């Protein structure tokens, strides 16, 4: 490719080599850049020969420009190079790349304007439509194309998916290309649900608009004819400008790009939002010691996009920070690549760097370079070795701090603290040893920064207990338990290297907890030695072994064996580390804490500790001391006012004790959590796996940190015996057992931790429920166990241990109460107790065991056992077993004698579910894929209503099994049901409440399900017709039931202790008893009709059971319901017959009036039921029979929760006329009027009329020109009304008025034929809506509701004034149990016989005779020795 040098002539080449790559930079363009550019062009399939001319360069730039926004850094570099080359060809003088890009942009703008001018002059009608909302039409006018739904959809999708991550900004910029302010507001409206983000955006836009107004003051005097006014800040934001004005400004000559300006403001706001959602700074992005370079680069660029900086600054960040913040291993490689390395080269070079594998390779290489393996090494061998020097000031290699040109870094170069220089620094290597032990005579120094780091949940650390020959526990005892969090430590983000003193020489050595021995590089040590061979990563090396050698590490001494030989690095091994008391500590967990809050308005628990026995106090002190050492709890002082009781119980079948904290009070006060897992996993859903392991996470909750701000609320106190000393106070640092938030936070944290492992190993199945883990794979057992170890290490890195004790490697596996075998599963063995007498608690436990067993043992029944538990009984109450329950229990014992197993799920086969009827409303089912190999079994015995039939129960059972199958396997089974298709069809077609059931087939398993009787669809010709009715008096409970027939027969019976519903059923029973084999029955009871139409064959009601018996005996029965009895003679007669002396009000009288009212006003059913005292079913029937009310169904009247003074206004159009609608948001009350024109004058007049009738505080409108006019603003100012608009100035939607517009139009449609003019119909519709439709809050009409809201508001304000006055009083009171006066408490309410007070957070009612009310005169009232102050101190 050397031929590419011909691109430039000699003179041009000179110019080329004078142009700088960056403004103010040292590097300049060279020939190699042209060669590189030609190679890159070939990669992109562009002819490199185009570089030789300016026209060719222009074509290349045109090709590359669209890719700049989405392209890589290489494309940007190529574009910059070609742009500079174009300037050299065109003989345009430029000093650097930036100038060249500016010149190119200038030229492009000129050519664009020229092209537009030419197009305008020639009236070019065939112009291709650009992707901008403003285009030129055939007449040459600039018209607006609204932003497309597709664009809006893309914008909503990116916000929902990315949640304001940095990618949102370029996406918004691309989608909003050329948009008008109105389009931009539409885009913001679509994501208006993100209230916090929109509020921030609104503030930014307000600031920018104010700044625009400040920089562009309004010119004095009138605007010249033909000229446009200059836009204000609010015009640019689209609030006070029309679309035509916006188009005018954007297409004017010269143009004012209001769209681009507004877009820039929005992007500024989006930047702030992104910073809020992605708070990490680019300076904080550092590569972890074992983090792959690729992951680090991803994080780096993601954060870089969120930075608010120019492209130049971002380029500089990429060049410097990317390398600078890499870990030491990657940094060495990146520096070796040189400054001009591409990202691709960097990622290739750093592939596989980091972690133990990399360490092994480095050590192997280092050891292979050690040529001399002689036992004795001469000093001369080290003469020419030069150590690389590194500057303390700037951190660069090659010079020392004395010669450094960089500005001097503040403070000490060693420890980073200000106030001293490095030569005076008393710090040792990373404060490695405890100061009070390293320097016993000296004064211990502060460890503030180290302590902070020790408590940090994100650090890994190596910690030392400095001691002589004490054990760690003894040392801890000597220091009175102060060990835990005051230990110095060194984090493992860098290699733990310390300075050691051995044989009078100072050396640097690596602390290696993985090395058994201490190995030092060649040096002379006193005493005898013996030769030895030791194995290293690179093979075996010969060393000299010296025994009893004294080593001093930072002033602390240890004596042990030291090996001397050709090691690439000095290593202090475990033989000396154990003497020093060095421990490798895993912090609690480096995962992020989940923020937790108390419920609004609540404070933490303040429950007193109850007395404990001496034994329990000792146990608790012991447990808490151990927990404190482990960092699970910390001591707190008296400044923490919260407390929760603590106690201890003995563990089951053990002498060990267990600490329990009664968190009931804290649980009441803690926010609610969404339970991450909605149920437990089931073994039938497990796929058969070749290898399986079950793990248990040890101390699960104690491995997850608790939110720091919430810890104070978990405080508890261990009391002392006889109050000898103040109690010891602790608070939790981790998730406590028994606290309501622990399960949800633990499960969420565990899921996050397992996510990367699941992604890396998609073939491994991990079922996670709390601390139980089931891991299955199809790997060979050896590979599987390797993966298990990887998983255990992965969990360990996050602070979760998996104890060997609960690590199950071989089957059967005990998991979640199940027993898992390689090809089958069962429940863990179940033993039913043998008892002579059964208590309520015993039966509850028995039912629980049987329910658990029923998932694999088919045929288990518990209905009769459950009947024993009906009613409220004490747990210890003895219950005799009924004969049925005895029999049921005996059957269950027989079933459980034979062990039954389930098989595992095979995704390639279909699921089949088979149901059998067991009688007495009990059903059993099996789910399988192959016959006789059940996945799981179960039972169903629930009666959803008092009256049911087998078909209905069968449907409910099928739906239960379907739901269960979807949860376990994610699909529905095919059903085999004991019911014939004809029976099912006969019931299903008539019974409208039957819901969907999946695919099924008939299986002839007795007993079959059948319908015992069927109701006729049409009246039976020739059969006697019975008009039945019943009535009861609510007070006396006396009633009558009877019938009248079309053949003149009649009968009435008197009833006692009855209800209206019972009498109606009794009447039907009479009719059935006294009729032949065929009968027509007419009733006015919707209740009775509902029961019988469902064709029940069993019922808990004796009366309904008797009716069922009668129905089964009949050949044909027709049952009808008549809502309006008038006109049906039989019904009128029977009404008079049964209601004599019984009914107080007959609802039938109101039906006619209600129907008349509905024909006029089309009132909804609630209004009619309320006004005419009708039963809801009758009122609904009247609405249902009205053809005009069935067009769009019943309107929903849900209310928006808003303050009483807010109204929404909008204009809607009907029949070519304009209707101005105002809605009172809180009540739904409407004011509407037909206005002659949509002008500011008419709108202002309407608003003033509205303000004269109702208290209007705020009006909320859209950005229509009539609402934004100065006339309306003046009217609002005069009436003291605040005006609000849509986004961005107020994110509240126009939803209420929009829905009311539709509702109003619907009502107008119902009454339009009653009025000649539309304005009359509008007022009729307003009247109907406000006073004839009830529903929503309080069941009122809108008119009643607005009056109620305003009245309540006035009362509340008055009450508030009184409350404010009453709160100035304090109350001293006496409890009934204690003679001492308590207080002072706050007075909340004062009644005739009692007062309501608030003492701390408790609200109490105290009788007046036990309360003294005084005015709050301030603190001086309570003297030092007054009763109140003494009480507080206690």
Swiss-Prot record:
Chain residue ranges for the region called RT 'primer grip': 813-821
Modification Phosphotyrosine, positions: 132
Site positions per UniProt: Essential for RT p66/p51 heterodimerization: 987, 1000
Positions of the Integrase catalytic domain: 1200-1350
Zinc finger annotations (Integrase-type) as residue ranges: 1149-1190
N-myristoyl glycine lipid sites: 2
Active-site residues, record numbering mapped to chain: 512
Cofactor names: Mg(2+)
Domain annotation Peptidase A2: ranges: 507-576
Residue segments, region Disordered: 106-128, 443-480
Binding site for Mg(2+) 3: 1210, 1262, 1298
GO biological process: DNA integration; DNA recombination; establishment of integrated proviral latency; proteolysis; symbiont entry into host cell; symbiont-mediated activation of host apoptosis; symbiont-mediated suppression of host gene expression; viral genome integration into host DNA
GO MF term set: aspartic-type endopeptidase activity; DNA binding; DNA-directed DNA polymerase activity; exoribonuclease H activity; lipid binding; RNA stem-loop binding; RNA-directed DNA polymerase activity; RNA-DNA hybrid ribonuclease activity
Superkingdom, natural source: Viruses
A cellular component term, taken from the record's GO annotations: virion membrane
Motif (Nuclear export signal): 16-22
EC number of the protein: 3.4.23.16, 2.7.7.49, 2.7.7.7, 3.1.26.13
Site for Cis/trans isomerization of proline peptide bond, residues: 221-222
Region (Dimerization of protease), start-end ranges: 488-492, 536-542, 575-587
Keyword Protease (UniProt): yes
Additional observations: HIV-1 lineages are divided in three main groups, M (for Major), O (for Outlier), and N (for New, or Non-M, Non-O). The vast majority of strains found worldwide belong to the group M. Group O seems to be endemic to and largely confined to Cameroon and neighboring countries in West Central Africa, where these viruses represent a small minority of HIV-1 strains. The group N is represented by a limited number of isolates from Cameroonian persons. The group M is further subdivided in 9 clades or subtypes (A to D, F to H, J and K). Resistance to inhibitors associated with mutations are observed both in viral protease and in reverse transcriptase. Most of the time, single mutations confer only a modest reduction in drug susceptibility. Combination of several mutations is usually required to develop a high-level drug resistance. These mutations are predominantly found in clade B viruses and not in other genotypes. They are listed in the clade B representative isolate HXB2 (AC P04585).
Identification of the protein by name: Gag-Pol polyprotein
Organism, scientific name: Human immunodeficiency virus type 1 group M subtype B (isolate OYI) (HIV-1)
Gene name of this polypeptide: gag-pol
